[in-house]
């Protein structure tokens, strides 16, 4: 029997850099409350959100991803010619086809490289990061861009008091490649499809096209169900990720959970028994929930402010629509 040849690549893979793009428009809680019976204090107390960013009409998930990738490449001291592939993780690339990744690669000037989109709700960044690391270790690529990008603002029903204050827009990218020491641990991922309706688009686009004068599609959220699932299940996911990476909770310097709700993340910190001085990302306060972009955006913010530094040992946990989750231990990159 003829054997099929295989390839292998770098054994030690890590994050070389991160780059963030935040839209200019800042939307306050007071502006959100013009459409609902609520207040800045009520929203902040329950979510930890004070402001968020909304993209301009001429901005898209792909255009924001491109800018984030440019900044990540610059921070790594690389050019588009040094990249072998792009993975875009998003829930808001509003074209069924073509995928966003080849468009982003072309905009960067990276011709002929591999590119694909990955959709796993708010856990998408963890899935994409794991895929990139495995591709590099398998020899399919040497250096890759992974970018989380979302334009969620058009999907929000601004009169839905249950979630109109949560979601926001933005993008952040990391460069993944060979490092002197292991910089990305195994990905622990899974899903609970029995709770798929907990975060959902309520009307599909085909149904809407058949009745364009009817209700339009929006994202709907069953907040209490998601809160319970995340607060009480994701602690175990984090422990499994640490076990897989061979590290203890007291060795974690930085905790970067999905920026869905600061109250959920406060419970996770207690559940995980991290060190009292461990840095906990709280980018949600001025960024909102940017779904697949939230973890890399939060990483960028920690590095920009100096709250974390390159090389710090970080636990990442993404969770959301699906319901899906993905977690891994990484070394923080350059900002």
UniProtKB/Swiss-Prot annotation:
It comes from Mycobacterium tuberculosis (strain ATCC 25618 / H37Rv). Signal peptide: none annotated. Changing residue 161 to A: Retains 69% of wild-type activity. Loss of activity. It catalyses: malonyl-[ACP] + dodecanoyl-CoA + H(+) = 3-oxotetradecanoyl-[ACP] + CO2 + CoA; hexanoyl-CoA + malonyl-[ACP] + H(+) = 3-oxooctanoyl-[ACP] + CO2 + CoA; octanoyl-CoA + malonyl-[ACP] + H(+) = 3-oxodecanoyl-[ACP] + CO2 + CoA; decanoyl-CoA + malonyl-[ACP] + H(+) = 3-oxododecanoyl-[ACP] + CO2 + CoA. One of its GO terms (biological process) is fatty acid biosynthetic process. Catalyzes the condensation reaction of fatty acid synthesis by the addition to an acyl acceptor of two carbons from malonyl-ACP. Catalyzes the first condensation reaction which initiates fatty acid synthesis and may therefore play a role in governing the total rate of fatty acid production. Possesses both acetoacetyl-ACP synthase and acetyl transacylase activities. Possesses a clear preference for long-chain acyl-CoA substrates rather than acyl-ACP primers. This is Mycobacterial beta-ketoacyl-[acyl-carrier-protein] synthase III. Was identified as a high-confidence drug target. The modification N-acetylthreonine is found at residue 2. The modification Phosphothreonine is found at residue 45. The last Arg residue of the ACP-binding site is essential for the weak association between ACP/AcpP and FabH. Keywords: Acetylation, Acyltransferase, Cytoplasm, Fatty acid biosynthesis, Fatty acid metabolism, Lipid biosynthesis, Lipid metabolism, Multifunctional enzyme, Phosphoprotein, Transferase. Residues 259-263 are annotated as: ACP-binding. It is found in: Cytoplasm. It comes from the Bacteria. Pathway: Lipid metabolism; fatty acid biosynthesis; Lipid metabolism; mycolic acid biosynthesis.
